[in-house]
């Protein structure tokens, strides 16, 4: 599988007691080289999004479905997802977040086991395995399409309003 082509396992990082877990699809080249999730340009944008929402990278937990980089930056294959999904589920059981933020269509379709468009899933509360989930654009998509940033921010605001309600905290 992917173990033969990767440099590092990119398991995830952040607060193991986080109330928010951010999930992408798979590590990219920079993440594979460093062994850390979301460290390239997409990660820098994710950090800015989190900061705008009132969180630091250290307060949340950030991971991907796949723990190894697919060659050529391709989408994960079904057997790779089946191999890695138990690791993601164990991470979520240990952390037990209040909210999960899924980044992008591939991550959302994979986790929710559906084929819906990103537009049909974005910005609204979805429940999966007892977790409250929100879906927005992947930061890499925002870098390619800056006009989507407004929609992403609306999604993040919806997530934060929900977070404030369930955690009894004021936000935004």
PLM features per residue range, with description:
Residues 1-172:
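A polyanion-binding, active-site-adjacent surface
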């Amino acid at each position: 599988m992917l173990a033969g082509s990767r440099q590092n396992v990119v398991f995830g990082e952040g607060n193991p007691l986080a109330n928010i877990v951010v999930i992408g699809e798979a590590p990219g080249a920079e993440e594979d080289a460093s062994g850390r999730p979301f460290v390239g340009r997409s990660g820098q944008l994710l950090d800015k999004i989190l900061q705008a929402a009132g969180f630091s990278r250290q307060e949340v937990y950030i991971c991907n479905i796949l723990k190894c980089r697919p060659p050529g930056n391709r989408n994960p294959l079904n057997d790779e997802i089946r191999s890695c999904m138990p690791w993601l589920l164990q991470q979520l059981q240990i952390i037990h977040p209040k909210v999960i933020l899924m980044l992008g269509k591939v991550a959302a379709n994979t986790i929710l086991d559906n084929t819906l468009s990103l537009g049909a899933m974005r910005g609204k509360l979805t429940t999966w395995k007892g977790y409250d989930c929100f879906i927005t654009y992947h930061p890499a998509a925002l870098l390619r399409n800056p006009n989507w940033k407004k929609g992403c921010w609306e999604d993040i605001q919806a997530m934060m309003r929900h977070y404030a309600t369930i955690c009894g905290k004021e936000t935004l």
